[in-house]
Amino acid sequence: MAKGQSLQDPFLNALRRERVPVSIYLVNGIKLQGQIESFDQFVILLKNTVSQMVYKHAISTVVPSRPVSHHNNNPSGGSSNYHHGSTPASQPSQPESDDAE
């Protein structure tokens, strides 16, 4: 699993589980507010007066209204198994080398 997912998922899951109000800033500067209802590899479902499906590629920053504990409780140090999918084989998570194009 990619390192980004192993940080993202416990953080988002803690926000969802504890119903923490969040501000989500998009790459175009728009600020969305609400609670994370659910999420998967590509989207976050944000609920306020309405539910909005927000694509992760459009998100710049997720800011919780209060501190949350998002430590992984798996004693083996691995990732919890609450993910709803995996990265397709056709999409590598990291480039293999640092060669310039």
From Swiss-Prot:
Chain intervals with Low complexity compositional bias: 70-86
Q: Which Pfam families match?
A: Hfq
Question: What keywords is this UniProt entry annotated with?
Answer: RNA-binding, Stress response
Q: Which CDD domains match?
A: Hfq
Extract the PANTHER family matched here. Answer: RNA-BINDING PROTEIN HFQ (PTHR34772:SF1)
Name a single GO cellular component: cytosol
Signal peptide segment: none
Q: What name does the UniProt record give this protein?
A: RNA-binding protein Hfq
* Domain Sm span(s) in chain numbering: 9-68
Superkingdom is Bacteria
Coiled-coil boundaries = none
Question: Per the similarity annotation, which family is this?
Answer: Belongs to the Hfq family.
Gene name of the encoded protein: hfq
Q: Where is this region: Disordered?
A: 63-101
Gene3D superfamilies per record: 2.30.30.100
Recall the GO molecular function terms of this protein's record. RNA binding
